[in-house]
Amino acid sequence: EALWESMGKDSTDLDDLIENVAIATVGDVMDLEDENRIFVKEGLQMLKRTKNPGLKALIECTGIDKESLNSYHIGFVLGPCINASGRLDTAKRALKLLRVRTQKEADILAGDLKALNDSRKDMTEEAVKLAKEQVETTDLSDDRVLVIYLPDCHESLAGIVAGRIRECYYKPVFVLTDAEDGAKGSGRSIDGYHMYEELNKCKDILTKFGGHRLAAGLSLEKENIAEFRRRLNENCTLTEEEMKEKVTIDMEMPFLCVTEELVKELELLEPFGKGNTKPIFAARGVTLLGARILGKNRNVLKIKAQDANGSVIEAM
Protein backbone atom coordinates (compact mmCIF):
# COMPACT_ATOMS: atom_id res chain seq x y z
CA GLU A 1 0.00 0.00 0.00
CA ALA A 2 2.88 2.35 0.88
CA LEU A 3 4.57 1.57 -2.45
CA TRP A 4 1.32 2.25 -4.30
CA GLU A 5 0.91 5.63 -2.58
CA SER A 6 4.57 6.53 -3.21
CA MET A 7 3.77 6.16 -6.91
CA GLY A 8 1.09 8.81 -6.51
CA LYS A 9 -1.81 6.39 -6.81
CA ASP A 10 -4.96 6.04 -4.73
CA SER A 11 -4.61 3.07 -2.35
CA THR A 12 -8.29 2.23 -2.81
CA ASP A 13 -7.43 1.23 -6.39
CA LEU A 14 -5.46 -1.68 -4.94
CA ASP A 15 -8.71 -3.60 -4.63
CA ASP A 16 -8.71 -3.98 -8.41
CA LEU A 17 -5.53 -6.06 -8.14
CA ILE A 18 -7.03 -8.70 -5.85
CA GLU A 19 -7.97 -10.90 -8.83
CA ASN A 20 -4.30 -10.89 -9.88
CA VAL A 21 -3.27 -11.75 -6.31
CA ALA A 22 -5.66 -14.71 -6.36
CA ILE A 23 -4.19 -16.02 -9.63
CA ALA A 24 -0.62 -15.61 -8.34
CA THR A 25 -1.34 -17.23 -4.96
CA VAL A 26 -3.05 -20.33 -6.35
CA GLY A 27 -0.85 -20.54 -9.45
CA ASP A 28 2.32 -20.52 -7.35
CA VAL A 29 0.84 -23.15 -4.98
CA MET A 30 0.94 -20.98 -1.86
CA ASP A 31 -0.81 -22.10 1.34
CA LEU A 32 -4.45 -21.01 1.39
CA GLU A 33 -4.35 -19.95 5.02
CA ASP A 34 -4.94 -16.68 6.91
CA GLU A 35 -4.72 -13.63 4.59
CA ASN A 36 -3.99 -15.78 1.54
CA ARG A 37 -7.32 -17.55 1.87
CA ILE A 38 -9.14 -14.22 2.14
CA PHE A 39 -7.27 -12.78 -0.86
CA VAL A 40 -8.15 -15.80 -2.99
CA LYS A 41 -11.77 -15.91 -1.86
CA GLU A 42 -12.29 -12.23 -2.69
CA GLY A 43 -10.19 -12.49 -5.86
CA LEU A 44 -12.36 -15.31 -7.17
CA GLN A 45 -15.46 -13.16 -6.73
CA MET A 46 -13.74 -10.36 -8.68
CA LEU A 47 -12.68 -12.77 -11.44
CA LYS A 48 -16.31 -13.74 -12.01
CA ARG A 49 -17.03 -10.14 -12.99
CA THR A 50 -13.56 -9.10 -14.18
CA LYS A 51 -13.19 -6.01 -16.34
CA ASN A 52 -9.77 -7.10 -17.57
CA PRO A 53 -10.21 -7.91 -21.30
CA GLY A 54 -7.43 -10.49 -21.24
CA LEU A 55 -8.71 -12.45 -18.26
CA LYS A 56 -12.26 -12.23 -19.59
CA ALA A 57 -11.13 -13.67 -22.95
CA LEU A 58 -9.10 -16.45 -21.31
CA ILE A 59 -12.03 -17.50 -19.12
CA GLU A 60 -14.31 -17.62 -22.16
CA CYS A 61 -11.95 -19.45 -24.53
CA THR A 62 -11.21 -22.15 -21.93
CA GLY A 63 -14.93 -22.79 -21.49
CA ILE A 64 -15.15 -21.92 -17.80
CA ASP A 65 -18.60 -21.11 -16.43
CA LYS A 66 -18.00 -17.79 -14.66
CA GLU A 67 -20.50 -18.47 -11.89
CA SER A 68 -18.84 -21.75 -10.91
CA LEU A 69 -15.26 -20.44 -11.21
CA ASN A 70 -13.13 -21.59 -8.25
CA SER A 71 -9.52 -22.20 -7.21
CA TYR A 72 -9.39 -25.39 -9.30
CA HIS A 73 -9.90 -23.34 -12.47
CA ILE A 74 -6.99 -21.06 -11.54
CA GLY A 75 -4.66 -23.93 -10.68
CA PHE A 76 -5.51 -26.29 -13.53
CA VAL A 77 -6.99 -24.19 -16.35
CA LEU A 78 -6.11 -20.48 -16.28
CA GLY A 79 -2.74 -20.84 -14.52
CA PRO A 80 -1.33 -23.42 -16.96
CA CYS A 81 -2.38 -21.27 -19.94
CA ILE A 82 -0.61 -18.25 -18.46
CA ASN A 83 2.47 -20.33 -17.58
CA ALA A 84 2.63 -22.07 -20.97
CA SER A 85 4.04 -18.98 -22.66
CA GLY A 86 6.98 -18.87 -20.24
CA ARG A 87 7.56 -22.60 -20.52
CA LEU A 88 7.54 -22.90 -24.32
CA ASP A 89 8.05 -19.37 -25.64
CA THR A 90 8.27 -16.11 -23.70
CA ALA A 91 6.37 -14.94 -20.62
CA LYS A 92 5.87 -11.59 -22.40
CA ARG A 93 2.93 -13.12 -24.27
CA ALA A 94 1.05 -13.75 -21.01
CA LEU A 95 1.94 -10.27 -19.76
CA LYS A 96 0.64 -8.79 -23.00
CA LEU A 97 -2.67 -10.59 -22.48
CA LEU A 98 -3.05 -9.12 -18.99
CA ARG A 99 -2.28 -5.59 -20.26
CA VAL A 100 -4.27 -5.63 -23.49
CA ARG A 101 -6.91 -2.89 -23.89
CA THR A 102 -9.24 -4.13 -26.64
CA GLN A 103 -11.43 -7.22 -26.44
CA LYS A 104 -10.64 -8.16 -30.05
CA GLU A 105 -6.91 -8.34 -29.40
CA ALA A 106 -7.56 -10.07 -26.07
CA ASP A 107 -9.53 -12.83 -27.81
CA ILE A 108 -6.66 -13.45 -30.23
CA LEU A 109 -4.01 -13.53 -27.48
CA ALA A 110 -6.13 -15.78 -25.25
CA GLY A 111 -6.63 -18.21 -28.13
CA ASP A 112 -2.88 -18.27 -28.75
CA LEU A 113 -2.15 -19.04 -25.09
CA LYS A 114 -4.74 -21.81 -24.99
CA ALA A 115 -3.26 -23.35 -28.15
CA LEU A 116 0.21 -23.11 -26.61
CA ASN A 117 -1.01 -24.85 -23.46
CA ASP A 118 -2.73 -27.56 -25.51
CA SER A 119 0.61 -28.12 -27.24
CA ARG A 120 2.32 -28.25 -23.84
CA LYS A 121 -0.17 -30.91 -22.68
CA ASP A 122 0.45 -33.02 -25.79
CA MET A 123 4.21 -32.77 -25.32
CA THR A 124 3.83 -33.71 -21.66
CA GLU A 125 1.69 -36.77 -22.45
CA GLU A 126 4.24 -37.96 -25.01
CA ALA A 127 7.11 -37.51 -22.54
CA VAL A 128 5.19 -39.32 -19.78
CA LYS A 129 4.49 -42.20 -22.19
CA LEU A 130 8.20 -42.50 -23.07
CA ALA A 131 9.18 -42.30 -19.39
CA LYS A 132 6.78 -45.10 -18.45
CA GLU A 133 8.14 -47.25 -21.28
CA GLN A 134 11.66 -46.79 -19.91
CA VAL A 135 10.60 -47.76 -16.40
CA GLU A 136 8.58 -50.80 -17.46
CA THR A 137 10.83 -52.24 -20.19
CA THR A 138 14.29 -51.78 -18.63
CA ASP A 139 16.01 -52.53 -15.33
CA LEU A 140 14.86 -49.11 -14.08
CA SER A 141 11.85 -50.94 -12.65
CA ASP A 142 14.13 -52.42 -9.96
CA ASP A 143 15.35 -49.00 -8.78
CA ARG A 144 13.99 -47.30 -5.68
CA VAL A 145 15.01 -43.91 -7.11
CA LEU A 146 14.11 -43.42 -10.77
CA VAL A 147 16.54 -41.50 -12.99
CA ILE A 148 14.93 -41.14 -16.42
CA TYR A 149 16.82 -39.63 -19.35
CA LEU A 150 14.59 -38.14 -22.06
CA PRO A 151 16.96 -36.28 -24.40
CA ASP A 152 14.21 -34.78 -26.57
CA CYS A 153 11.90 -33.65 -23.76
CA HIS A 154 11.53 -29.86 -23.48
CA GLU A 155 13.51 -28.89 -20.38
CA SER A 156 10.64 -26.82 -18.97
CA LEU A 157 8.48 -29.96 -18.81
CA ALA A 158 10.92 -32.11 -16.82
CA GLY A 159 9.38 -31.20 -13.46
CA ILE A 160 5.83 -31.88 -14.65
CA VAL A 161 6.84 -35.26 -16.08
CA ALA A 162 8.75 -36.17 -12.91
CA GLY A 163 5.66 -35.37 -10.84
CA ARG A 164 3.45 -37.54 -13.05
CA ILE A 165 5.86 -40.48 -12.88
CA ARG A 166 6.13 -40.14 -9.10
CA GLU A 167 2.32 -40.41 -8.92
CA CYS A 168 2.41 -43.60 -11.03
CA TYR A 169 5.06 -45.50 -9.07
CA TYR A 170 5.32 -43.58 -5.76
CA LYS A 171 9.10 -43.37 -5.96
CA PRO A 172 11.48 -40.39 -5.98
CA VAL A 173 11.94 -39.41 -9.64
CA PHE A 174 14.50 -37.40 -11.60
CA VAL A 175 13.80 -36.56 -15.25
CA LEU A 176 16.83 -35.38 -17.23
CA THR A 177 16.88 -33.78 -20.68
CA ASP A 178 19.52 -32.52 -23.09
CA ALA A 179 20.75 -28.99 -22.45
CA GLU A 180 23.22 -26.70 -24.22
CA ASP A 181 25.99 -27.92 -21.95
CA GLY A 182 25.34 -31.48 -20.77
CA ALA A 183 22.05 -32.56 -19.22
CA LYS A 184 19.68 -30.85 -16.84
CA GLY A 185 16.46 -31.78 -15.15
CA SER A 186 14.11 -31.78 -12.20
CA GLY A 187 13.25 -34.14 -9.40
CA ARG A 188 10.07 -34.80 -7.43
CA SER A 189 10.16 -36.76 -4.20
CA ILE A 190 7.98 -38.65 -1.73
CA ASP A 191 7.71 -38.42 2.06
CA GLY A 192 10.73 -40.03 3.67
CA TYR A 193 13.22 -39.05 0.96
CA HIS A 194 14.95 -35.67 1.34
CA MET A 195 15.81 -34.86 -2.25
CA TYR A 196 18.19 -31.96 -1.60
CA GLU A 197 20.21 -33.90 1.00
CA GLU A 198 20.55 -36.86 -1.37
CA LEU A 199 21.75 -34.58 -4.17
CA ASN A 200 24.29 -33.10 -1.78
CA LYS A 201 25.85 -36.56 -1.43
CA CYS A 202 26.44 -36.58 -5.20
CA LYS A 203 27.59 -32.97 -5.57
CA ASP A 204 31.03 -33.95 -6.93
CA ILE A 205 29.42 -35.19 -10.18
CA LEU A 206 26.84 -32.40 -10.48
CA THR A 207 27.49 -29.12 -12.28
CA LYS A 208 24.94 -27.36 -10.08
CA PHE A 209 21.86 -28.22 -8.07
CA GLY A 210 19.31 -26.77 -5.69
CA GLY A 211 15.99 -27.53 -4.11
CA HIS A 212 14.38 -28.77 -0.92
CA ARG A 213 12.90 -31.92 0.63
CA LEU A 214 10.31 -32.69 -2.06
CA ALA A 215 11.67 -31.10 -5.25
CA ALA A 216 14.97 -30.20 -6.86
CA GLY A 217 16.68 -29.02 -10.02
CA LEU A 218 20.10 -30.06 -11.28
CA SER A 219 22.55 -30.17 -14.16
CA LEU A 220 25.42 -32.55 -14.89
CA GLU A 221 27.58 -33.93 -17.68
CA LYS A 222 25.85 -36.62 -19.76
CA GLU A 223 28.60 -39.13 -19.04
CA ASN A 224 27.77 -38.86 -15.32
CA ILE A 225 24.09 -39.85 -15.65
CA ALA A 226 24.71 -43.59 -15.10
CA GLU A 227 26.93 -42.89 -12.08
CA PHE A 228 24.35 -40.45 -10.71
CA ARG A 229 21.66 -43.14 -10.93
CA ARG A 230 23.93 -45.74 -9.32
CA ARG A 231 24.85 -43.53 -6.36
CA LEU A 232 21.31 -42.37 -5.65
CA ASN A 233 20.10 -45.96 -5.45
CA GLU A 234 23.13 -47.13 -3.50
CA ASN A 235 22.56 -44.38 -0.91
CA CYS A 236 18.77 -44.83 -0.76
CA THR A 237 17.49 -46.08 2.61
CA LEU A 238 13.76 -46.09 1.80
CA THR A 239 11.95 -49.14 3.20
CA GLU A 240 9.11 -51.02 1.50
CA GLU A 241 6.70 -49.49 4.00
CA GLU A 242 7.91 -45.95 3.21
CA MET A 243 7.33 -46.61 -0.48
CA LYS A 244 3.64 -47.38 0.03
CA GLU A 245 1.55 -44.29 -0.58
CA LYS A 246 -0.58 -43.34 2.40
CA VAL A 247 -3.95 -41.60 2.23
CA THR A 248 -5.00 -39.61 5.28
CA ILE A 249 -8.76 -39.36 5.76
CA ASP A 250 -10.53 -36.67 7.77
CA MET A 251 -13.25 -38.98 9.06
CA GLU A 252 -15.29 -42.10 8.39
CA MET A 253 -18.73 -41.43 6.99
CA PRO A 254 -21.59 -43.83 6.18
CA PHE A 255 -23.25 -43.40 2.78
CA LEU A 256 -26.45 -42.23 4.50
CA CYS A 257 -24.70 -38.95 5.43
CA VAL A 258 -23.70 -38.12 1.85
CA THR A 259 -26.38 -35.62 0.86
CA GLU A 260 -26.73 -32.50 -1.28
CA GLU A 261 -27.01 -30.52 1.94
CA LEU A 262 -23.60 -31.80 3.05
CA VAL A 263 -22.07 -30.83 -0.30
CA LYS A 264 -23.48 -27.29 0.08
CA GLU A 265 -22.05 -27.04 3.60
CA LEU A 266 -18.62 -28.16 2.41
CA GLU A 267 -18.62 -25.34 -0.15
CA LEU A 268 -18.38 -22.93 2.80
CA LEU A 269 -14.84 -24.21 3.37
CA GLU A 270 -13.69 -23.05 -0.08
CA PRO A 271 -11.38 -21.99 -1.61
CA PHE A 272 -9.56 -25.33 -1.46
CA GLY A 273 -5.89 -25.77 -2.27
CA LYS A 274 -2.52 -26.23 -0.60
CA GLY A 275 -2.91 -25.71 3.15
CA ASN A 276 -6.71 -26.02 2.91
CA THR A 277 -7.27 -29.26 1.03
CA LYS A 278 -10.66 -30.76 0.27
CA PRO A 279 -11.80 -33.03 3.11
CA ILE A 280 -11.49 -36.76 2.47
CA PHE A 281 -14.14 -39.13 3.81
CA ALA A 282 -14.08 -42.92 3.82
CA ALA A 283 -16.42 -45.82 4.49
CA ARG A 284 -15.46 -49.30 5.66
CA GLY A 285 -16.98 -52.62 4.71
CA VAL A 286 -18.05 -51.43 1.27
CA THR A 287 -19.35 -53.95 -1.27
CA LEU A 288 -19.14 -53.16 -4.98
CA LEU A 289 -22.48 -53.99 -6.60
CA GLY A 290 -21.64 -52.95 -10.14
CA ALA A 291 -19.34 -50.88 -12.35
CA ARG A 292 -19.48 -49.41 -15.86
CA ILE A 293 -16.98 -47.51 -17.99
CA LEU A 294 -18.54 -44.53 -19.75
CA GLY A 295 -17.61 -41.59 -21.97
CA LYS A 296 -16.36 -41.03 -25.48
CA ASN A 297 -12.78 -41.61 -24.33
CA ARG A 298 -13.77 -44.48 -22.00
CA ASN A 299 -12.24 -42.60 -19.08
CA VAL A 300 -15.24 -42.31 -16.75
CA LEU A 301 -16.07 -44.98 -14.16
CA LYS A 302 -19.57 -45.27 -12.70
CA ILE A 303 -20.04 -47.57 -9.71
CA LYS A 304 -22.82 -48.77 -7.45
CA ALA A 305 -21.80 -49.69 -3.92
CA GLN A 306 -23.27 -50.68 -0.56
CA ASP A 307 -21.79 -49.85 2.84
CA ALA A 308 -21.81 -51.93 6.02
CA ASN A 309 -25.12 -50.35 7.08
CA GLY A 310 -26.87 -51.46 3.89
CA SER A 311 -27.05 -47.99 2.30
CA VAL A 312 -26.59 -48.04 -1.48
CA ILE A 313 -25.01 -45.20 -3.43
CA GLU A 314 -24.02 -44.49 -7.03
CA ALA A 315 -20.77 -42.66 -7.76
CA MET A 316 -18.76 -41.41 -10.73
Regions picked out by a protein language model, each given a short descriptive name:
Residues 103-111, 115-149, 201-316:
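Mid-to-C-terminal polyanion-binding domains and interfaces
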Residues 5-223, 294:
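Hydrophobic helix-and-loop "lid/oligomerization" segment in the mid-to-C-terminal part
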